[in-house]
Amino acid sequence: MAKSKNHTTHNQSRKWHRNGIKKPRSQRYESLKGVDPKFLRNMRFAKKHNKKGLKKMQANNAKAMSARAEAIKALVKPKEVKPKIPKGVSRKLDRLAYIAHPKLGKRARARIAKGLRLCRPKAKAKAKAKDQTKAQAAAPASVPAQAPKRTQAPTKASE
């Protein structure tokens, strides 16, 4: 069987320090030696319940906090609101609305332009295509036209 622990050391030091580790009573009020102990006791209670001082302290804290908040506000730039993706009625209109958006559409427009550039025929290919079309146009004029295969001769329609 496990031993039962009557005395715990858990959190004891925290408990001692919560109220401060106190000096012995004889040394507590060195500057007030020879003063009535009852008066000293009352003074302790007065310290605890000194509302006027507390209110002053709270007011000072509030001032300090507001000054700090203003300083932070001056340093930190306001955050921009993120633009939401515009919604259209249909998918096609959705896409158009997205492309037309001033910020969001930048990348989309760039991609579309790139795609168009890639699809466009190159200069050499253009020249080659022109040569081929010229050659094709010249070829049928010199060679007599042949009748296509599997065509039947026109027959007279019976009346």
Curated annotation (Swiss-Prot):
A Pfam family: Ribosomal_L29e
Biased composition (Basic residues): 1-26, 117-127
Region of interest called Disordered, as start-end residue ranges on this chain: 1-32, 117-159
GO cellular component labels: cytoplasm; cytosol; cytosolic large ribosomal subunit; cytosolic ribosome; membrane
Residue stretches of biased makeup (Low complexity): 134-149
Residues the record lists as Phosphoserine modifications: S31, S142
PTM sites of type N6-methyllysine: K5
Sample GO molecular function, one term: cadherin binding
Residue list for modification N6-acetyllysine: K33
GO biological process, alphabetically ordered: cytoplasmic translation; embryo implantation; translation
Chief location category: cytoplasm
Keywords assigned by UniProt, alphabetized: Acetylation, Cytoplasm, Heparin-binding, Methylation, Phosphoprotein, Repeat, Ribonucleoprotein, Ribosomal protein
Family from the record: Belongs to the eukaryotic ribosomal protein eL29 family.
The protein's assembly and partners: Component of the large ribosomal subunit.
PANTHER family, sorted: 60S RIBOSOMAL PROTEIN L29 (PTHR12884:SF18)
Chain's role: Component of the large ribosomal subunit. The ribosome is a large ribonucleoprotein complex responsible for the synthesis of proteins in the cell.
Name this polypeptide is given: Large ribosomal subunit protein eL29
Name of encoding gene: RPL29
